[in-house]
A protein has these predicted regions:
Chain A
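Noncatalytic alpha-helical scaffold of FAD-dependent oxidoreductases
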Residues: 1-479
Length: 479, 394
């Protein structure tokens, strides 16, 4: 993975930079000792590491603003960081960069049930946003599987999704307002407690911009009352094609489940050995969950099970208790952990049109054989967001490279059938160089023109999202 | 005789100037690239919102047709000039719909012509179901557009979840043709509901009504419409529930119990009556006839009654649980009166009908205005796409 060469002028001015930062930051908010900055050398994509020049952990929007103003003034690249759980290398530093981490900014600023929103500092974790309102019966809907650890700042940067977004949408559909600091230190307010912010939809633009347009320090998020109940049904098939057809029929029938999850045989076996959820040993497993009162759930599950039966399932099991529901989900939720127990793996995140599911699964199977690497599939079938897990051996020379090559081929396949490279993890550095498979140069040019407006010197989160060759001229011109 | 690529448009919108009406994206791109004067970008011209643009009209109304429809994947790809009505019929044939319930502006603005799907997204037009399903922009998956230099560009795709690169799809939604001319759109569609019930409370004052709507919206019973309106029979506070039959009946009962302290409620389950009721709210039918300027306010719901009370002679239709306020005020009511009330609370106000010479859109804070101007300068360096609309000087 190529990263831009560190700027020697910046490296040489390190002490001057630190002096300026130390002039207003409390001691604990500024980290520059190499033994301590090492903790920030990578995110969830651990294959790539690089310690930053320094790490700033501000406690307020004002401190973020002042830090950015100084970095902008001195031409120092800045890497924004939430909780560092990105699987795409979205928070990978460069040697000449300052990390601004929001980890100390975790306050709830306002909770308003009448108007159904919560305003938080963005270092707060996803799950603890729900934690702040659940006693009163409310929740924050987007639920990425890293929700225990991941921060709202990162959720906004990557426009994170989750298992339940089929019904509730992803981050962008639940974000009402932000306080965002631009690279030059300007503090902006966009949106708020009202719907549809004024002017151009900058909120929509910022969400998913991978920290390249500004640092979001506060967010107004939509909260909803929890449903009365939820219950999953487990459906097993002997072919993934039939499972795919079943998903399509459920959607067409007008039922809108909150989640439709899909696991294939390699994944079922690994999960079963790990979590013992009682999954059948079959080719394809669906977990379909619906919400409402008991009677409403019965009504919806009846429709779903009627559809499932028409496709001749090898297993059809409705959860009859809260305990059983938990066990059904336990298998799915521990899928990544289970795979990790038996192997090193790389998790992909392409999205495909739902109707292409059988073809894509068949092709992935063929490619897996070609490359000699096993692939397990577990994903959100309702919206076509695939998570193929490629198993490899990190200790075996050349295996990581082979795995990355297969990964790239699978993502290209997703694009070919009308899908995209990433559904919820983001581009980061991981898929940066594949962007030209998805977009033509003019399509990328206009995206880069957006960055020109927000960050004319191209200092924010360098070397992410765009192929290095495409953004080279801009970064060099800015130096 | 009609020249190729030109068509006589409705008089009230196009004025006397013949509109450019390309029949293909390539032709449109060529027209924009070779334009030597400002262009007034439009779909069917039924939503003349904002200060009228002084320029050569260019309409997408001849870019029509459904390119792809996958009911099982809930996706539709359609040309920008396709009539909304055609989209509605196509979806209805498969039991699906545009869940964000786009408003038809013709009644309120006295326009004629055919609303287009491109126009719906260019103005980010959403109806009552916005509170539950999301806005138009939440249903836009991908776009193709022609920027101010005539360059064809695409962003997004036709899948539900996509974070590949910057989300220009959202940026294009609600940009009123100021960043580019939409040519093709990929949409997420949803199943239509089998049953509908509307629970109506009568005689509530505005503050009590909005509080009642908030209580219902803060329940687990999935309200898909929450409005408060004045009728010949007095004020009505309406809550809509949709879904399968038993579920609708159950939730309607729960809502009645929840709001029992506010008097007896009436429950309407007749499909046609419900359709008419919510169409009237969606299209602001109560203000179609008669004089008066029309303002559209987006505010925090609980602030809405107080804001309305500050404007002399104002009548209000509250939608989105109070978050969307349609105000009818005496003609030429000074904009400052309304803006001051909205700004003090937070939110924004747009003058939809009335003398818009002083500006129609909410003035932006200086840093946001600078970003917006910067984006327009990048997407449209010559400043020829709807100059003057959305605040940027012509």
């Amino acid at each position: 993975m190529d990263m831009p060469k560190p700027n020697p002028t910046i490296l040489a001015r390190k002490s001057q930079l630190l002096d300026r930062l130390a002039s207003f930051l409390p001691r604990e908010a500024l980290i520059h000792d190499p033994s301590e900055t090492r903790a920030y050398e990578c995110d969830g994509l651990t294959a790539y590491k690089c310690p930053p020049l320094a790490v700033v952990l501000p406690a307020s929007t004002a401190e973020v603003s002042e830090t950015l103003r100084i970095c902008n003034d001195m031409g120092v690249p800045v890497v924004p960081r939430g909780a560092g759980t990105s699987l795409a290398g979205g928070a990978l530093p460069t040697e000449d960069s300052v990390i601004i981490g929001v980890a100390r900014m975790t306050e709830v600023l306002e909770t308003d049930y009448d108007n159904r929103f919560i305003r938080v500092q963005t270092g707060r974790t996803n799950l603890s946003v729900t934690g702040a309102v659940e006693e009163d019966g409310f929740f924050y809907a987007p639920d990425p599987s890293s929700q225990l650890a991941c921060a709202i700042a990162g959720n906004i940067a990557m426009n994170s999704g989750g298992a339940h977004c089929l019904k509730y949408g992803v981050t962008t559909n639940n974000l009402m307002g932000v306080t965002m600091v631009l690279m030059d230190g300007t503090v902006t307010e966009i949106g708020g407690a009202h719907l549809d912010a004024e002017g151009l939809d900058l909120l929509g633009l910022i969400c998913g911009s991978e920290g390249q347009l500004g640092i979001v320090t506060e967010a107004t998020l939509r909260i909803l009352h929890k449903p009365e109940g939820a219950r999953p049904v487990l459906i097993g098939y002997d072919s993934s094609e039939i499972a795919g057809q079943c998903v399509s029929d459920i959607i067409k029938a007008g039922v809108l489940p909150v989640a439709i999850e899909f696991m294939d045989r390699p994944c079922i076996r690994a999960t079963e050995a790990f979590a013992g959820a009682g999954y059948p040993d079959c080719e394809a497993l669906l977990i379909v969950e619906v919400e409402g009162s008991d009677a409403e759930i019965d009504e919806q599950l009846e429709t779903i099970m009627d559809i499932a039966r028409k496709h001749d399932p090898v297993e059809l099991r409705q959860s009859s208790s809260e305990d059983e529901s938990k066990r059904i989900w336990l298998g799915r939720k521990s899928a990544f952990g289970a795979m990790g127990k038996i192997n090193d793996y790389m998790c992909l995140d392409g999205t495909i049109p739902v109707n292409e599911l059988p073809y894509v699964l068949k092709r992935i199977g063929e490619m897996s054989k070609e490359y000699g690497l096993d692939v397990a599939n577990v994903f959100h079938a309702g919206d076509g967001n695939m998570h193929p897990l490629i198993l490899f051996d990190a200790n075996k020379e050349g295996d990581l490279e082979l795995c990355e090559e297969l990964g790239a081929e699978i993502l290209k396949l997703c694009v070919e059938v009308g899908g995209c490279l990433t559904g919820e993890h983001g581009v980061g550095i991981e898929k940066r160089d594949l962007m030209l498979h998805q977009y033509d140069p003019p399509d990328l040019e206009i995206q880069m023109a957006v960055k020109d407006v927000f960050d004319p010197k191209w200092l924010l989160n360098p070397a992410k999202v765009f192929p290095l060759a495409s953004s080279d001229t801009r970064r060099i011109a800015a130096e | 005789m009609t020249l190729p690529g030109r068509c006589p448009g409705p008089r009230s919108i196009f004025g006397t100037m013949k509109a450019l009406a390309p029949t293909s994206e390539a032709e449109l791109a060529e027209m924009v690239a070779s334009a030597s004067e400002p262009l007034r970008i439009m779909g069917g011209g039924t939503r003349p919102i904002g200060v009228p643009v002084n320029g050569q009209p260019l309409t997408t109304s001849r870019l029509t047709g459904v390119t792809l429809y996958e009911p099982g994947a809930l996706t539709l790809v359609v040309q920008a000039g396709t009539p909304v009505e055609e989209v509605r019929k196509t979806l209805a044939a498969e039991g699906q719909r545009l869940a964000f319930e786009p408003m038809d502006h013709r009644g309120l603005l006295g326009t004629t012509g055919e609303p287009t799907i491109g126009g719906v997204f260019a103005a980010n037009v959403s109806g009552p179901r916005r509170i539950q399903a999301g806005a138009a922009r939440d249903f836009l998956l991908g776009v193709r557009f022609v920027d101010g230099q005539g360059q064809v560009t695409r962003n997004g795709g036709r899948v539900m979840k996509n974070v590949t690169g910057y989300d220009l799809v959202k940026l294009m939604a609600g940009s009123y043709g100021t960043l580019g001319v939409l040519t093709e759109l990929a949409l997420k569609v949803l199943p239509a509901s089998h049953h509908t019930a509307t629970i109506t409370l009568s005689g509530l004052d505005d503050t009590t009504a909005v509080a009642a709507l908030s209580r219902a919206l803060g329940s687990p019973f999935e309200i898909t419409g929450a409005a408060h309106r004045q009728t010949a029979d007095g004020p009505q506070t309406c809550l809509r529930i949709e879904g399968f039959e038993k579920s609708v009946a159950y939730r309607a009962g729960q809502i009645q119990t929840l709001l029992a302290d506010l008097g007896a409620a009436k429950v309407e389950t007749d499909p046609d009556t419900n359709t008419t009721l919510w169409q009237d709210i969606r299209d602001v039918a109560c203000f179609h006839d008669g004089e008066g300027d029309i303002w559209r306010l987006s505010v925090k719901p609980s602030d809405a009654p107080g804001i309305k009370a500050q404007v002399d002679g104002a009548e209000a239709l509250y939608d989105w649980g109070g978050g969307l306020v349609w105000l009818r005020v005496p003609q030429n009511t000074h904009a400052d009166t309304i803006r001051a009330a909205v700004n003090a609370a937070g939110g924004h106000a747009t003058l939809i009908r009335g003398n818009r010479a002083g500006g129609a859109f909410q003035p932006l804070s200086p840093p946001i205005a600078a970003l917006q101007d910067g984006l327009r300068a990048r997407f449209d360096p010559r400043g020829i796409l709807n100059p003057g609309l959305m605040g940027r000087a012509a």
